[in-house]
């Protein structure tokens, strides 16, 4: 019976892909005056605040947007990517609201900001709104790219504070104060273009505490748990209108030893998917998925099998234990993988999207959407990391993304109709 049901669902997905194929093109130009509603949660689902209607999405990552937009002569590339994304039906974008020290720093030193770079972020928020795309904005990086925890630790060291390790970021009062100040600065920012504070702008779907948090000094997850609890509450004290998520990859901890042993890809990073996401001020859970990195050397079939288990186990736990929505916040296929071909990326993305749709349908919308890593425009070679997708140069990938967008939109309409007739 389970096999038959799966075949029926897959058949429906394929049928929708055919029906909504090349002829389904979303808008390519901004829609002046269009207003977005705030997204909130209702149990394990996203809903739109104004209508209480279900919200599912297909989305993308574009970490580079503020960095590029800080140069006004390059802003057209941001607009172009938003236009291409909108044309493919993508409605959520995850990007950085940080650049700590270094090139084009937003935060030059603790509490000191470059207004030109901040205006770049203003532009990103404004352009997203024009194209009907919501944003997930991340506050800091776990890694040294664009500063991250390492830069915070260095700032404190330079100020004469005794810092032992980057993991002090989660516990040292000075580092926590630096970070809280940055949160306050971003959340309360008054946009110079929209003339609206970020905390009042429904273009922003959610705040992300940190990109891929890890704490090597405490594998139990308790250190990170205390930090998340404190920082999520702090964000909510400034802004009760927006959702908050952690930015986790999804690694299991001691709460579920069987998941830790059989689902984790052999990693311990000091996080616990269950306890970290059970914190009351965390509104939804995220996972990232990179089997081409985590299971390097394994076959494509083995990597795809892991991907299916990774998604299905987290969906089950989000629905049954967390009772919160789940987002696949990063996934992709790198051109740097041995033997890479565009066809491999097409097959992989098609399979992942198929499973996301299937799990979203099976879970009643708990698996609410995904964000492919990552979209870029032409002439951005300096930002390439192997995962970049330039839609204008890869029409086959653009078609796969577009069909997934329409599949998720159709499923959202199906849930809306059923709710209204329940």
Language model: regions and residue ranges:
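Cleavable N-terminal signal peptides of Sec/SRP-targeted secreted and luminal proteins
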Residues: 5-26
